[in-house]
Regions:
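Catalytic domains of riboflavin
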Residues: 1-363
Length: 363
C-alpha cells in the first residue's frame, strides 16, 4: 500500500482530521491515530476509544506543560522509550465524571486553548498529557513529538491527541493491519521516518559553528563543533580521513563517562573514548562523535557501584540524543555506519538517511 506524503498528512491535520503515523519495526512497531488537540471533538475521542482502543493521550510542548504547571508522573523516567507522562488532567469546568467522550474532548480543549491557564485544569483526570522533547522528531523520534510537529506544521498550537491502534483480539496493530485500518476508515497514513526526512530538508536544530585541525596522541584529527539551537548543548565530532556516503564509515557516538574516559576504569563491553579514537586511527578514517549532554548523577553513581561490585548496570538508551547525533552524522556526509557499539535499537534513523550496516563490539 502506498503511504501518504507528509504534505498530505499536514493538510488533513489542518482540516481537523485524524491521520495515522507508524514508527520503526525495531522500536514500538506501532501506529497511532494523531490529530491536532485544538481540533479535537467528542466524535474524535469516541472514534479512538471505539476503533483504536489504545490509551488516549495528549502530547504537548514542554512550555505548555510548564504553563499548566504539570509535573511529570515519575521524577525519574524508567520507561523503555523515555515517554514523559505528566500527571493526568481534567477540565475544571464543563465536565461531569470526566470519562465520557464529550468530557475528555472538553478537557483537551481546555488544555490546548491559546489562552489556557493552570487554573483551567485539575488533577487527576481522564486525559494523559505527554511532554514532548524540544526540537520535536529531530530530537526524539516518538509519536509524542510527531503529534506536536504535525500540529505546528498545520498552523495549530504544538499539541495533539494520540491513541495507539489495537487489533480486535487486543494485540497491537502492525503495518499490514494499520494499512487495512486506514483504508477501512479512509484515514491517511505515513511514517515518523518520513516526517523526520521532511523536516531535515526544511529545517534542522543542530548547526555547525567551527572546524579546526586537532593534533592528538592518536593522530591528526579534524575537530568539528556543533551547537544545538534547542537545548544549547555543544557537541564535537572528531573526523579522520575521507567520509564517503557510498562506503560504510566507522562511527562511535560517545557519551562521556568520567570513570571510563578520565580515570580509565575498565568497563567490559563498553568503548572508551581513547579506544574509539584508536580504532578510527587504525582504520584510517571514521568519526568519533562526542555528545555534550551532562553526565547524569544517578548513572554515574550506578557506574561507581558496578565498578566496586564488579557488576554491570544496563544504561537505558537516551532517545533524546539520537536526533542530535543523527543530524551531525548526516552533515558530515555519513550515510552507512559501522557503529562501535553493542546492538541497539534506534527509531526512524532512516529519516536522517542513515543506516547501521554493522555493530562493532569493544575488545
Amino acid at each position: 500500500v502506498a503511504l501518504n506524503s507528509i504534505e498530505e498528512l499536514v493538510e488533513d491535520i489542518r482540516q481537523g482530521k485524524m491521520v495515522i503515523l507508524m514508527d520503526d519495526e525495531d522500536r514500538e512497531n506501532e501506529g497511532d491515530i494523531i490529530m491536532a488537540a485544538e481540533a479535537c471533538k467528542a466524535e474524535h475521542i469516541n472514534f479512538m476509544a471505539k476503533h483504536a482502543r489504545g490509551l488516549i493521550c495528549m502530547p504537548m510542548s514542554r512550555e505548555r506543560c510548564e504553563l499548566l504547571k504539570l509535573p511529570l508522573m515519575a521524577p525519574r523516567n524508567g520507561s523503555g522509550f523515555g515517554t514523559k507522562f505528566t500527571v493526568s488532567i481534567e477540565a475544571t469546568t464543563g465536565v461531569t465524571t470526566g470519562i465520557s467522550a464529550a468530557d475528555r474532548a472538553r478537557t483537551v480543549q481546555a488544555a490546548a486553548a491559546k489562552d489556557a491557564k493552570a487554573e483551567d485544569i485539575v488533577s487527576p483526570g481522564h486525559i494523559f498529557p505527554l511532554m514532548a522533547q524540544p526540537g520535536g522528531t529531530l530530537a526524539r523520534a516518538g509519536h509524542t513529538e510527531a503529534a506536536c510537529d504535525l500540529a505546528r506544521m498545520a498552523g495549530f498550537e504544538p499539541s495533539g491527541v494520540i491513541c495507539e491502534v489495537m487489533n480486535d483480539d487486543g494485540t497491537m496493530a502492525r503495518r499490514a493491519e494499520l494499512e487495512a485500518f486506514a483504508a477501512e476508515h479512509n484515514i491517511k497514513i505515513g511514517t515518523i521516518a518520513d516526517l523526520i526526512h521532511y523536516r531535515m530538508i526544511h529545517e534542522r536544530t543542530v548547526q555547525r559553528i567551527a572546524e579546526q585541525p586537532l593534533d592528538s596522541e592518536l593522530g591528526q584529527f579534524n575537530l568539528v563543533t556543533y551547537r544545538d539551537s534547542v537545548e544549547g548543548d555543544v557537541h564535537m565530532a572528531l573526523t579522520l580521513g575521507t567520509i564517503c556516503a557510498d562506503e560504510p564509515t566507522l562511527v562511535r557516538v560517545h557519551n562521556m563517562d568520567p570513570l571510563r574516559d578520565l580515570l580509565m576504569v575498565k568497563q567490559p563491553g563498553r568503548w572508551s573514548l581513547r579506544a574509539a579514537m584508536a580504532a578510527v586511527s587504525a582504520a584510517g578514517s571514521g568519526v568519533v562523535l562526542l555528545l555534550g549532554n551532562p553526565v547524569d548523577g544517578d548513572v554515574l553513581l550506578a557506574h561507581i557501584r558496578e565498578t566496586a561490585e564488579n557488576t554491570q548496570v544496563k544504561t537505558p538508551t537516551t532517545y533524546s540524543i539520537v536526533g542530535a547525533g543523527s543530524q551531525i552524522l548526516r552533515d558530515l556526509g555519513v550515510r552507512k555506519m559501522r557503529l562501535m557499539s553493542a546492538p541497539m535499537k534506534f527509531n526512524a534513523i532512516s529519516g536522517f538517511d542513515l543506516e547501521v550496516v554493522e555493530y562493532v563490539p569493544s575488545e
